[in-house]
């Protein structure tokens, strides 16, 4: 395997500016090519396994060197033309240059290797539930805003490895109904003269533009994130409501703090309604500016259907506990099948929305939602439940949650994860030798085509007291 071009490489070792010829042997977890030279790992964004390229080293990152391609010397049979013209610059979707079947194969192999390495788990996976659309799947976008030195508004995601905006007029992974609004909204905000600087210098003005759509209803909610009240937005908001019938509401979210957290605590209505309707698994939900809701609605419905189907095969004498329940996207479909469900969630606003959604769908009598620390609430609810569903944030289950589960293990446990590494870590503890559980099934779900992300559902069954 060629490693250098033999012209600049020497025994002095790697340094910024050094030119090499390398061949990628794998992709890292961010979807960038990985090569080796003189014992060093070299990251080559844009290079696929098996491809050779002339590269230039840029900077050292701990035990790795970041490089950029000067010239790609050959092409993998799995390479394709990216569907987005900004794919090489934008840091949002790092696998667009890889055919989608190859994306899925790589993701499933990543899942297998991660489970084996971090969890000691060598278990067959079911084929990933895939989104055949590939594009246009995102029901929400939060897009940074900034005025350039020429005073023109830039709107787009960050350039790879930086906080510089890649100016865009469309985004192919956005729902096409939202994508059609991106350019006219940018033009309106540009001509408004309002200052804009997402979070670089934290100057006053616009920070982000938020777009959200009900996949099944077509209703749209526009949100402008700003550091302060901007009276000029009131006029724009009314114009948007009148211009586009699907736009049911325009809100202003205030984020005055110096933080990377996009949304602030205060949201006000500029025009129309504060929420939009969505139909999810046949149930009606209300989505606001700050509601946490899965980005890919059809894929979320498929994974919830898997959970409902698996739990419905068992004779459950007690209730199902849904930990990290959010607004009830798993709890309510389970209740609709006749189960009694107890939802646990630390965010009181989400609990309020879950209760409202339950009442709106006639499921209030079969659901109970509690706000508070999940570990503490589990200690009070596990003794009487027959099954547990957990859908934690990316950091995975807190140690106290795992201890609560192992102290009083329910008969069935469904663990949905958005981070395979933390899930593998947690499963290692839940599946410890002489422990109460055995792993029954791994079901990966590709929520985010063109990216490295893969969600995974693990089904565990209790085998001992």
From Swiss-Prot:
Entry EC no(s): 2.1.1.-
Residue ranges of domain TRAM in the record: 13-71
Enzyme class at the top of the EC tree: transferase
UniProt-recorded Gene Ontology molecular function terms: 4 iron, 4 sulfur cluster binding; metal ion binding; rRNA (uridine-C5-)-methyltransferase activity
Residues binding [4Fe-4S] cluster: 84, 90, 93, 171
Binding site for S-adenosyl-L-methionine: 294, 324, 345, 391
Family matches, as CDD domains: AdoMet_MTases
Biological process annotations from GO: rRNA base methylation
Pfam families: Methyltransf_31
Xref: InterPro entries: Methyltranfer_dom, MeTrfase_TrmA_AS, MeTrfase_TrmA_CS, NA-bd_OB-fold, SAM-dependent_MTases_sf, TRAM_dom, U5_MeTrfase_fam
UniProt-annotated catalytic positions: 418 (nucleophile)
Key words, A-Z: 4Fe-4S, Iron, Iron-sulfur, Metal-binding, Methyltransferase, S-adenosyl-L-methionine, Transferase
Family indicated by similarity: Belongs to the class I-like SAM-binding methyltransferase superfamily. RNA M5U methyltransferase family.
NCBIfam families registered for this protein in UniProt: rumA
Protein name listed in UniProt: Uncharacterized RNA methyltransferase SYNW1228
Organism per entry: Parasynechococcus marenigrum (strain WH8102)
């Amino acid at each position: 395997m060629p490693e250098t071009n033999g012209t600049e490489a020497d025994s002095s070792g790697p340094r910024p500016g050094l030119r090499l010829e390398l061949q990628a042997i794998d992709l890292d977890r961010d979807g960038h090519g990985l090569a080796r030279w003189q014992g060093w790992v070299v990251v080559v964004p844009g290079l696929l396994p098996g491809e050779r390229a002339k590269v230039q080293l840029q900077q050292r990152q701990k035990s790795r060197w970041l490089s950029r391609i000067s010239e790609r010397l050959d092409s993998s049979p799995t390479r394709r033309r990216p569907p987005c013209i900004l794919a090489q610059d934008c840091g949002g979707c790092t696998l667009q240059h890889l055919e989608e079947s190859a994306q899925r194969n790589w993701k499933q192999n990543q899942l297998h290797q991660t489970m084996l390495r971090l969890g000691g788990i060598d278990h067959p996976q079911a084929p990933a539930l895939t989104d055949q659309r590939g594009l246009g799947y995102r029901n929400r976008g939060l897009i940074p805003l900034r005025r350039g030195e020429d005073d023109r508004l830039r709107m787009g995601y960050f350039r790879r490895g930086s906080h510089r905006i890649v100016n865009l007029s469309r985004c192919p992974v956005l729902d096409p109904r939202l994508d059609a609004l991106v350019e006219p909204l940018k033009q309106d905000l540009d001509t408004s003269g309002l200052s804009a600087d997402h979070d670089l210098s934290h100057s006053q003005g616009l920070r982000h533009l938020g777009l959200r759509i009900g996949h099944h209803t077509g209703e749209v909610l526009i949100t402008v994130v700003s550091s302060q009240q901007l009276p000029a937005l009131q006029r724009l908001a009314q114009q948007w409501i009148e211009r586009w019938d699907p736009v049911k509401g325009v809100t202003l979210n205030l984020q005055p703090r110096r933080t990377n957290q996009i949304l602030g605590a205060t949201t006000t209505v500029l025009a129309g309604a504060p929420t939009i309707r969505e139909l999810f698994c046949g149930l009606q939900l209300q989505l606001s500016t700050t509601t946490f809701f899965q980005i890919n609605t059809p894929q979320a419905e498929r994974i919830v259907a898997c959970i409902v189907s698996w739990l419905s095969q068992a004779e459950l004498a007690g209730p199902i506990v849904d930990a990290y329940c959010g607004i009830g996207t798993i709890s309510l479909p389970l209740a609709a099948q006749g189960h009694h469900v107890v939802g646990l969630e630390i965010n009181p606003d989400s609990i309020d929305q879950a209760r409202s959604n339950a009442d709106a769908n006639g499921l209030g009598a079969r659901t109970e939602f509690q706000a508070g620390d999940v570990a503490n609430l589990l200690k009070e609810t596990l003794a009487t439940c027959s099954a547990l569903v957990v859908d934690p944030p990316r950091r995975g289950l807190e140690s106290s949650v795992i201890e609560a589960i192992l102290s009083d293990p329910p008969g069935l446990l469904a663990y949905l994860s958005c981070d395979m590494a933390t899930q593998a870590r947690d499963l290692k503890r839940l599946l410890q030798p002489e422990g109460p559980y055995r792993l029954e099934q791994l079901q990966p779900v590709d929520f985010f085509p063109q990216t490295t992300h893969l969600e995974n559902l693990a089904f565990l069954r209790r085998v001992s007291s």
